[in-house]
From Swiss-Prot:
Gene3D superfamilies in alphabetical order: Anticodon-binding domain (3.40.50.800), Bira Bifunctional Protein, Domain 2 (3.30.930.10)
The reaction(s) this protein catalyses: tRNA(His) + L-histidine + ATP = L-histidyl-tRNA(His) + AMP + diphosphate + H(+)
InterPro entries named in the record: aa-tRNA-synth_II, aa-tRNA-synth_II/BPL/LPL, Anticodon-bd_dom_sf, His-tRNA-ligase, HisRS-like_core, HisRS/HisZ
EC number annotated for this UniProt entry: 6.1.1.21
GO cellular component, one term: cytoplasm
Assembly and oligomerization: Homodimer.
HAMAP family per the UniProt record, alphabetical: His_tRNA_synth (MF_00127)
Protein name: Histidine--tRNA ligase
Pfam name, any one: tRNA-synt_His
Molecular functions per Gene Ontology: ATP binding; histidine-tRNA ligase activity
Record's signal peptide: none
Biological processes, Gene Ontology terms: histidyl-tRNA aminoacylation
């Protein structure tokens, strides 16, 4: 079937208007918060060698079912990145960025071939924070910083309807014992499991706990819990973590079935779940945890790391539902009726933009009536224009909301005054 040229691919979208404005505002919040918490921005390629993901997430759905893979003209197998942590770890190993503890932040598009639905796309944006190569005895403080950072971001975004879920997956040895017990348990219910989960019994039964369909089944809810396999050291670590969260009055819920969707997570994991019902179901807004075994895939041993990633589209949906986001209106429209006035207004526009005012102007002369129609359609708060028989070095300034008209000295513009009238119009 011939595809229409005027449709974007399934699972993708265009940002414009209100959505684009919110996206820019959200991105600004993330960059500001990253700076406040001393995270350095890192940019990795949108595509990587496929084995970076095939090696680090062999059983995860994002590799087994959702990875966009292709071969280049030289026969190298590449993949569009489905997540941001593995590429950052590759970069850390490649550039030897591991001499001391590092704090990285990223913001960009990811790609997964999954069924598009509300809050899920095939191209989607993630913002992520990673703390790499921290000291083992500082785990609870690393977790505290991550949680406080998330709460600070949500506060700036005006998002306050969520619950925090946490779990502790222990180390590889304990987890393997737990997985063996899970497999034995789920074998008894194999006839009630989805086809993919029957495969997971042998490959990684933890994935069954993470499956949205399986989670609703009673026998899955009653499956063995990881905490019954904790060592005394695990219990002590978990108690230190919860104690420090309580010290900072952070409300959380322990969910022993929480495992996260990527294979490399261990020790502490968490999710912030939306409770606003905006997304139609309780989806994670941000999730993450420790990934101490992932660095070994890149030749980095004894390398403690923790991180998390936000789903940007989900945040945008919630922000859209919470308040009426106004389009970014111009401060001033510079209206010209002659070519000479266009040149003068270009000079004025340069001056105003230098002072951070939002400005536009017409580049073709208009009649008075059509010119003011254009100015009103632009959404500007005020319009500058030259009147007939205007006093020398003066220009007229009209408030498009009130209709008030005044004369401004063109050669000595009072920026403080302009700022005050803009602010007054926004509060009107």
């Amino acid at each position: 079937m011939k595809k229409k040229l005027n449709l974007c691919p399934k699972g993708t979208y265009d940002f414009f208007g209100q959505g684009a404005k919110i996206f820019i505002d959200v991105r600004k919040v993330f960059f500001n918060q990253a700076k406040k918490f001393n995270f350095s921005y890192i940019e990795t390629p949108i595509f990587e060698y496929a084995n970076i993901f095939l090696t680090t997430n062999q059983i995860a759905d994002i590799v087994s079912k959702e990875l966009y893979k292709f071969f280049d003209k030289s026969g190298r197998e590449l993949a569009l990145r489905p997540e941001g942590t593995a590429p950052i770890m590759r970069s850390v190993a490649q550039h030897k960025l591991f001499q001391t503890e590092k704090k990285f932040f990223y913001f960009g598009p990811m790609f997964r071939y999954e069924n598009p639905q509300k809050g899920r796309f095939r191209q989607f944006y993630q913002a992520g924070f990673e703390i790499i190569n921290y000291k083992k005895d500082s785990l609870e403080f690393q977790i505290l910083e991550i949680i406080l950072l998330i709460k600070s971001i949500f506060k700036d975004l005006g998002i306050n309807e969520y619950e925090i879920k946490i779990n502790f997956l222990s180390n590889l040895t304990t987890r393997n014992i737990y997985k063996k017990n899970l497999a034995q348990y789920f074998e008894k219910f194999s006839d009630k499991l989805e086809p993919i989960s029957k495969i997971r019994i042998k490959k990684n039964p933890l994935r069954i706990l993470d499956d949205k369909i399986e989670q609703e089944k009673e026998f899955v809810k009653l499956a063995p819990k990881i905490n019954t396999f904790w060592t005394m050291e695990d219990k002590n670590i978990f108690n230190r973590i919860t104690s420090i969260l309580e010290e900072f009055k952070i409300i959380y819920k322990v969910d022993y079935n929480l495992v996260r969707g990527l294979d490399y997570y261990d020790d502490f994991v968490f999710e912030f779940i939306d409770t606003s019902q905006t997304l139609g179901t309780k989806l994670a807004l941000v999730g993450g945890g420790c990934y101490n075994n992932l660095p070994t895939k890149f030749g980095l041993n004894n390398f403690k790391s923790i991180g998390m990633a936000f789903g940007i589209e989900r945040l945008i949906e919630i922000i859209k539902s919470k308040k009426n986001i106004k389009e970014q209106n111009l401060d001033f429209f510079l209206l010209s009726f002659t070519d000479k006035e266009i040149l003068l207004n270009f000079k004025l526009a340069k001056i105003l933009r230098k002072e951070n005012f939002l400005v536009d102007l017409n580049k073709t002369p208009f009649s008075v009536s059509k010119g003011f129609q254009l100015a009103k359609k632009s959404g500007a708060k005020f319009v500058f224009f030259f009147e007939k028989n205007q006093a020398k070095n003066y220009i007229s300034l009209k408030n498009l909301q009130t209709g008030k008209n005044e004369q401004i000295l063109y050669t000595e513009i009072n920026f403080e005054y302009l700022n005050s009238i803009i602010k007054a119009s926004e509060n009107a």
